[in-house]
Regions:
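TM-loop-TM module centered on a large, flexible mid-protein loop between adjacent transmembrane helices
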Residues: 77-109, 147-148, 154, 186-197, ...
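Extracellular loop-to-transmembrane helix junctions
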Residues: 63-206, 316-319, 326, 503-508
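Membrane-helix boundary/coupling elements in multi-pass transport proteins
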Residues: 64-67, 127, 141, 164-182, ...
């Protein structure tokens, strides 16, 4: 096991606990800590591997599912005020209305214009993406938004966003792992191989025991990926490159096969609900773009981070946008958007369209494989990023030093990787938490807000510091990012906000009773 980190003197020595909360760590100190031989990670990633990490994180199975839902629109009733959207409650309160109307949710159909929705959402995400690109090239450290906040906003904000990122990565991957388990179980059943429910379904669901012993497929996929990540980042990146290539190949095959089945009359009317349908469609598909920020967690393993991190972040966004727009144009040309309102057509629109229009079994099988690769690569990248967040927080002494241990042979943060694996694998084997999936979304948006704010602050505090990539039109572009992400946060439900606040309060208690006392700044002050 690697030796414990040497605690070096931070940029400043806060004279009080209050000053410590807002003390920023210098960028030079952050970089020098990363070069400590006892904690140095192996630099093996180039621009394609970084771009593939972004694509692997962004494109899951959603491209094969949400396109139809957003095109067809949806209408449902929330079971209680806790499941109402915060924005709806605010608007309704200002109008002086009752709560009944707030519980009724409706999104008009975007129809074929969902292609425009994908394009507009990509532009919205690019504002945050540009901010990540500037800070990632300027502060090439594994902690992503956590590290950027430590350098710009202070220790307490760094802790909050680090704790928030843990929530984002854990919840997201638990949900994906459970989805993978259910998907692989269904696919095996189609070949006559039935996995016993007691070993392939959640133990606890909707507040009661199910009679299952353990969701073994969900746990197994996380365990296998954890072993791969411990073995080395080069091996993990190569595996991700292969899965991304298969995933992109599956999408391209769909575009070719589906393109031959397009009936142009299905594109009329192009925008059945006008601009409102385009906007609400964008709200549904926005979260299919989340994941590009995970590229920044690979900063310390990139061969040329100043050049390649912006390429990975922006390149993955561009490639995914082209694929999303292409799939939406072809899918909505194959069948009328009203087809995808309910049933199998709503659950798996791409597979449904191929099957009902007589596509051969090979094309349908490719889509199944593409969806599986999408889930596995997403799991891999987020598990990778999660371990790097914990590693960075441990190196700053906000987490126990054990988390920043680096394997002597593989040069990976193996302890953090194993802990991250079990933190996801065990809950995935026991619980069904799909209703908590929005916790990942609110955590991501919160990180986007702080990173965008960090760009503005660093431009003011260190305007002459070299930047390999610069966000244009500062502060306007970062401000647009803050407004858009903040607005999307209000579109989430009340229960999501409550859970998010409870998680942050729990994190603050840990900070007060442990992290604050072990921080480098505290030791310097002492």
């Amino acid at each position: 096991m690697a030796q414990p980190p040497v605690v070096a003197k931070p940029e400043s020595s806060p004279s009080s606990a209050g000053n410590q909360l807002f003390a920023c760590k210098s960028i030079d100190k952050l970089i020098s800590d990363a070069e400590d031989p006892g904690h140095r990670l192996k630099k093996t990633l180039g621009p394609w591997s970084l771009t593939a990490l972004g694509i692997g994180a962004i494109i899951g199975s959603g491209i094969f599912v949400l396109t139809g839902t957003a095109a067809a629109g949806e209408f449902f009733q929330a079971p209680s005020i806790l499941h109402a959207q915060v924005l709806d409650l605010i608007v309704n309160f200002l109008k002086g209305g009752g709560t009944a109307s707030v519980l009724m949710h409706g999104r008009p159909p975007a129809g074929p214009s969902i292609a425009i929705s994908f394009f507009l959402v990509a532009i919205a995400c690019s504002f945050a993406g540009l901010c990540y690109a500037e800070l990632a090239s300027m502060i090439p450290i594994a902690g992503s938004a956590y590290t950027y906040s430590y350098a710009t906003l202070g220790e307490i904000f760094a802790w909050i966003i680090g704790w928030d990122l843990i929530l984002e990565y854990v919840v997201s991957n638990v949900v994906v792992a459970i989805g993978f388990g259910a998907y692989i179980k269904a696919q095996l059943a189609s070949f006559g191989l039935d996995l016993p429910d007691r070993w392939s379904t959640p133990v606890w669901e909707s507040g009661h025991w199910t009679g299952s012993y353990f969701n073994f497929p969900a746990f197994l996929i996380v365990f296998i990926l954890t072993v791969l990540l411990v073995r080395g980042v080069k091996e993990s990146a190569e595996a991700n490159n292969v899965m991304v290539a298969i995933k992109i190949g599956a999408i391209l095959i769909f575009l070719i096969v589906g393109g031959m089945l397009v009936n142009p009359t299905n594109w009329k009317p192009f925008a059945p609900s006008g601009f409102s349908g385009i906007v609400t469609g964008g709200a549904i598909v926005f979260f299919t773009y989340i994941g590009f920020d995970s590229v920044s967690t690979a900063a310390e393993e990139a061969r040329n981070p100043q050049r390649d991190l912006p390429i990975g972040i922006i390149g993955s966004l561009i490639i995914c946008t082209l694929l999303y727009v292409g799939v939406s144009i072809v899918l909505l040309g194959m069948m009328k958007y009203t087809t995808f309102v309910s049933g199998d057509a709503a659950q798996a629109p791409v597979a449904y369209a191929l099957e009902h229009l007589g596509a051969n079994r090979f094309a349908r099988s490719v889509i199944v494989i593409g969806a599986l690769m999408g889930m596995i690569s997403s799991l891999l990248v987020f598990q990778y990023g999660q371990a790097r967040i914990w590693y960075a927080m441990s190196r700053d002494c906000l987490f126990p030093r054990l988390f920043s241990a680096v394997h002597k042979k593989f040069k990976t943060p193996h302890i953090s990787t194993w802990i991250a694996g079990f933190a996801v694998g065990i809950p995935a084997g026991i619980f069904a938490i799909s209703d908590a999936a929005d916790l990942s979304n609110i955590g991501t948006l919160f990180a986007f807000v702080l990173v965008s704010l960090g760009v503005i602050l660093l431009r003011r505090k260190q305007p002459d510091r070299p930047r390999a990539f610069r966000v244009p039109l500062v502060p306007w572009f970062p401000l647009v990012s803050i407004v858009l992400c903040g607005g999307l946060m209000t579109g989430l439900t009340v229960i999501t906000w409550i859970r998010f606040v409870v998680w942050l309060v729990l994190g603050l208690l840990i900070y007060v009773f442990y992290s604050r006392k072990h921080s480098e700044f505290c030791k310097t002050r002492g």
